[in-house]
Amino acid sequence: IPLTEISWSPWIWVLGAWAGFRCHGRQCAIGDYYRNIHMYFLLGKDKAELDSQAKIKEEMNSMKWMSKDWFHKLYLYFYARYTGSQEAQVKSFHKMMQRLEEKYGDNIPADIRENFCRESRPLMPLTNIINFDTRVAVLFLSIGFGIPWFYFVFESTILEAVRFYVTGRHERLCERIMEQYTD
């Protein structure tokens, strides 16, 4: 580490890159998306921030790079990639939404929305764990105890396990809702 007497193997950079680019990005994206899905069913389409990559790309493609909107177009480019990474992790959710929209349009019945929220509510604290609070606490503690490499291990193991658990439970919830209300 620069300006300290600590020296690490070059492998710390590999571990850090893996934890940051592969694990952290997916964890935050899915935690954010699950909260937006929950808010969609709780508050409705107009009050939730449940965007689709296709709609973002459509808006982005309607703009020109050489215009006053170039910065917004650049923002939409990265936001579309982020939203695409979210959508790629929730295939059952998108199948469920497609079937619900085919059957009910934009008016998903209250009992379906309430059932979905009731079953997804226990997952919301876990989305907080994979988003910010827990990871910041572990980062500061690992630095404070002089073992900063522990944060990368924690990110790559514990938080990945939480992400897999939350994703599995949420995808099974979507499959149950799909079977119960769209067949």
Regions found by a protein language model. Name each.
Residues 23-24, 33-183:
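C-terminal membrane-associated helical module and adjoining short loops/tails
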Residues 1-28, 139:
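Multi-pass membrane catalytic core of lipid/isoprenoid biosynthesis enzymes
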